[in-house]
From Swiss-Prot:
Family annotation (Pfam families): zf-C2H2
InterPro entries linked: C2H2-ZF_Transcription_Reg, Znf_C2H2_sf, Znf_C2H2_type
Gene name for this UniProt entry: osr2
Chief location category: nucleus
Single GO MF annotation: RNA polymerase II transcription regulatory region sequence-specific DNA binding
Name recorded for this polypeptide: Protein odd-skipped-related 2
Record organism: Danio rerio (Zebrafish)
Subcellular location: Nucleus
Amino acid sequence: MGSKTLPAPVPLHPAPQLNYSLLRTLNAFPVAVDQLYGLSALHTVQMNRWTVGFPQLQGLADPRFPGALPFPAAAAHLLPHKHPVHRKDRPRFDFANLAVAATQEDPPVTGQSRLSPERRPARGRLPAKSKKEFICRFCGRHFTKSYNLLIHERTHTDERPYTCDICHKAFRRQDHLRDHRYIHSKEKPFKCQECGKGFCQSRTLAVHKTLHLQTSSLSAAAAAGRCFGATATCGATV
């Protein structure tokens, strides 16, 4: 028997493959069809594989993609380039040593190791602003305001920069000089709400109010003593 030359294998049911670039030029499909995931490259490779026994279909292949190239090399430049995502390596939680981790302190974070333990911020809270402290150079007393420190230091130096222009009496504070001037003007702007008596200085009114408080407390104590005595007398007669 003589050897017979077998023809090239032809697929029984080749899928009909179309060149979408050619169809786009003929206005058969919208422009955005061949932009989806590189369909032109995909169908070109399939056309080169399945048109072995169909020479009439080879004209539909897209000339931009050579048939010798495999699919990944032909369609790689059509697919969008994705940059590798750098993920932060998170430490895995050790459930086996949960009790040990709960009793130990957290390792110091960079930037917080310089802080002292009392000034280190708590979890979930911002570090509180430290109050300004003004220290007296004579006795070491602390103040939160510079004006209060200035007035306090004048008690050590006996500095009295505010002088009355009538009697030339000097004062450490400006409000003390203002109250002193009411004495010369015979004006008494500070009135007591209980007895209506007027005073030239607010400090004198404050001392006067303490007298009212002492008097009211003494009268209340005396009234309580009288009630107690009356109750005791009634109990004895019964």
